[in-house]
Amino acid sequence: NVCIHRMPLEQSLIRPPSQCPKCRFAIPWHLNMPIISWLMLRGKCKQCAEPISPRYIGVEILTGLAFLACWLTFGNQSTPGVLLAVTWSLVLAGLITATFIDFEHFIIPDEITLGGVALGFLVSAALPSLHEAERATASLTASGLGILVGGGSVLAVLQLGKWFFGKTRVPLEENE
């Protein structure tokens, strides 16, 4: 939720602490626990009683269920399974964040997409078997080619759009 709220506003994800958007009450840690706090406060700010959007508890439940599904699918296996569970949890958290930001602002922050690309590349080195490879170098090569083809395809579509329509619909730079 903090990512969904702050990333489009280009605010720090760490500071300042969470606060009520209406009265600016700084939410202490014990009132900022996923799901539990929303239920304890009956969906209202402790200070001003302003309703807290049900989106908050919905995102928390959705993310929790996604993490649970990843753990149940991969986590009970050996070390590679735990790494897969953590990796898929991060990927799903990024997708959930991107989806809700896109619903509200019609953007997907580069930090999410490029972070996912970097995560995929690093996991390829740690788990070469994802690319049906025995060595990390073969897996990294496959991952790198995937990045080049996928990224190149996006850039090609953007360039074609610019040629045909005179503008790009998905800017990759802030001043474009």
Regions found by a protein language model. Give the residues of each.
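A membrane-topology feature that recognizes alpha-helical transmembrane segments
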Residues: 1-176
